[in-house]
Amino acid sequence: MVMRVCIPTAGTGSRLKGLTKYVNKSLVGLDNRPILSHLIEQFPPDAEFVIALGHKGHLVRDFLELAYPNRTFLYSQVDPFEGEGSGLGLSLLKCKEHLQQPFIFISCDTLVREPIPPPEKNWMGYAEVDDLTQYRTMLVEKGAVVDICEKTLGRIPTHKAYIGLAGIKDYEIFWKAMEEGGKQAIDSGEAHGQRAFIGRGIDAHAFTWFDTGNPPALEKARTAYEKSGGPNILEKTNEAIWFVDGQVIKFSDDQTFIANRAKRAALLKGFVPEITGVKSNMYRYAEVEGRVMSDVVTVPLFEKLLQHCQTFWSEEPKSDQDKVSFKNGCMKFYKDKTFERVDLFFKNFEKKDGTESINGVSMPTVKTVLDNLDWNWIADGLPRRFHGDLHFENILWSGKKQVFTFLDWRQDFAGSLTTGDVYYDLAKLMHGLIVCHELIAQDMYQVKWEDKAIHFDLHRKQMLVECERFFESWIVKNGYDLAKVRTLTALIYLNIAALHHYPYSLLLFGLGKSMLANEKK
């Protein structure tokens, strides 16, 4: 018989706080893919999965269909999934019709290292922990479960922490207990049905367990599962890039963002990967052979990349967009968006626009700095085909094929899918040379924001410093305006500060403001 596995994902994941604002708790990232991927891949390829859907359930379904088109999933909608009448027991009862056979139950925040045995017997999984108070426990005698206790009732060493993983062989007995259990069954979940097995035999199985259901435990799991040499992706709450089974899946909470990304992939054909699947909040493409430029860059290779970019930028826009409308778009994209993002930064991080010195240098308010910029000069862009987020972490180099591939292209430029400003791409390249994503991911920076002073410092790679020097001379040699590139680079830091995690956000703001003030001098 094919193994059937029940994974309830209906809950809101409130213990994870802001991490589940935009995604279901099973889609929270761990080792550059959702926790749910780690669960799915613990089971044989022919296993069938019964998924209880609730909070942001459409995202769970869409992800599974994109990531695992050759696996079998059965879905049950849970309503209500929060508030009065909700509970894990309700999620299970909604799945009953698909679980009329022995099955595995696994919580969507449970990861284990060991192979998971089939439900040839009734069994419950446990792990050794130092503090039992926050877990349901089971009393184990001679390898068998003789009692199941609610939180705070277990005692070391006789009781073991139940980890939300179990084999249900006697499913008919289980379902009878769940249906007759009323509110207690709804609240207790699978444990209510499992209590019906006591006296009939429940094996206790030990596992190396990683809980991902609360922030401290999730952090431990992320550390344990982290692989060296992985991609350097700076975390955002409303976006993600997942690597699953040779595929790359891009998520955003913004459906227009995803739709336009997919449309632009066709416009950038030959420079970016081909999109192979699209859902409302995600798209998929095959993983591309190569290494990110930040890992392999040398000055000669950087020069080769810039030659490739010149070819990319050489295409004139096909639309009839005139210079005035393009400049208006640049004004909206640069000026209006900057003021909006600065306000968002102050709101997100509870800061005010002040005159704090930055690294010992006196500073006016950021509003003063922005008001004094020559926005007409900044908005006088160069309309061409564009990438929109062109930095080394978004560029792959295949030494074998001698080919560059651009990744994570921007969805639009001031509403246009076809035409952007070459200066923005140049500034994006510059911003990645100054701030190395790899070193930021390793927390190799410092920032301190006090009442009257901001201090920051960051590590840089010598090769990127050399590339920056070369880039500045290349910009001038090829007829571009270096001052404009550096001014836009500073604006980029100010713009993205609102979108990144604390305290990196403070570093970006301090760097952007100080760089902008210095460029103005």
Please give the residue ranges for each predicted region.
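Conserved N-terminal catalytic core of the sugar/cofactor nucleotidyltransferase
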Residues: 2-7, 15, 29, 33-103
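Conserved alpha/beta core of the MobA/IspD/sugar-nucleotide pyrophosphorylase nucleotidyltransferase superfamily
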Residues: 2-5, 159-244
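A glycine-centered beta->alpha junction motif in the catalytic cores
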Residues: 13, 254, 280-315, 339-355, ...
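Conserved core of the sugar-phosphate nucleotidyltransferase
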Residues: 111-185
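ATP-binding glycine-rich loop module of kinase domains
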Residues: 234-262, 281-296
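Active-site acidic catalytic loop and adjacent metal/ATP-binding pocket
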Residues: 241, 370-420
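Conserved kinase catalytic-core helix
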Residues: 266-272, 293-358, 363-380, 477
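Active-site activation/catalytic loop segments of kinase-like enzymes and analogous catalytic loops
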Residues: 412-473, 490-504
